[in-house]
Amino acid sequence: MKNTIEYVTVDNNHYLFHSDISFSMFIHPELAKVCGRQSGVDPYYVRKYAYLKDKGFFGEVLPVEFATTLEKSVIENNIAQVPQVSFETTDHCNLNCRYCSLGDLYTFSKKERKNIDPQKALRLLRFLFDVKLEGSEFAIVFFGGEPLVNGRFVEMIVEEAKRLNEKKKLKLEFTITTNATLIDRYLDLLVDNQFKMLISLDGDEKGQGYRTFMKDGTNSFWQAIRNIDRLQCEYPDFFEERVDFNAVLHDRNSVQEIYEFIYNRYHKIPSIAQMNKDHVNKEKKELMEQMFVDRRVSESDFQKTNSDLLPVVHDELIQFKELNDFFANNSVNFYMTNLLDLLYDHVSLIPTKTCSPFQRKMFFNTNSQI
């Protein structure tokens, strides 16, 4: 199998892609003719082809060598430098979202709901503060369930982290993902500690229709909106700087409706996720097919409109992001953000193609597992 392929865009622009080094570059049509073994080609591009071949293009794909072991010292170093710890604060939620990953739509749903063990979580937090370097960055994340159902735990961890940080002087940040229906009870906690908030909101009242209250099945839209509006009104600077939104795409909303509602009301561009189609309960497949909407299709419909928001959200659309990522990471203009990227032919890969454990974050769940 060759390591270099030539491809042509719809506008008849020619590119080469070198798979061994994940490198893409724009080429002249004459060079494309040489690649296609056509005759009557400008001799300059014949020489250019020979030069590229001498530098490793148009050869056989190199075999991939995987690292088989991770040294203990690597893991210990990762833990000492871990930039984030995420606490699964609780399995409980005050909402009963139809598409929730903890619900019966999926086979990996949790049958037993419980809160995190606070003493074990505190022990982990103190250990991490003990091993981290003074002045380093450290984010503490709370998720669930709805983490504010177990708000006392959040308060406890914040208090302890601040106490520990009096000595350690870390660049400390708190983050929470919430459905916003309980934030009115914890505004002082969230604002005083400059939480980074990610609010889950699926758009307008119809779009929010799958996010119903556990106790009576009513739509959570107005409770969430009242709380979000209050947060924006009473703490406008905090809201502007520390609050973001995410939404789930389904058959009761659309990419256009989500963007237009959240941007027009809060001047925020939300992230949008389509429903996960893996591990679906066999008995719920029909429901999944009813609810599922392909984001690409919904984005395509949005792009066919004359919405004033199209230029505003352009950079968030899948097509732009994929193209941007491809050229950012696979072109002659690739900006190296990691020195290891320069050593692609010397660094062994992990078979799962992931980062090594705790290199980026650490999770602690309600079963006291890391």
Name the predicted role of every residue range.
Residues 106-107, 147-149, 180-184, 196-218, ...:
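Conserved radical SAM core fold
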Residues 211-225, 229, 233-357, 363-367:
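Radical SAM enzyme [4Fe-4S]-AdoMet core and its adjacent flexible, acidic
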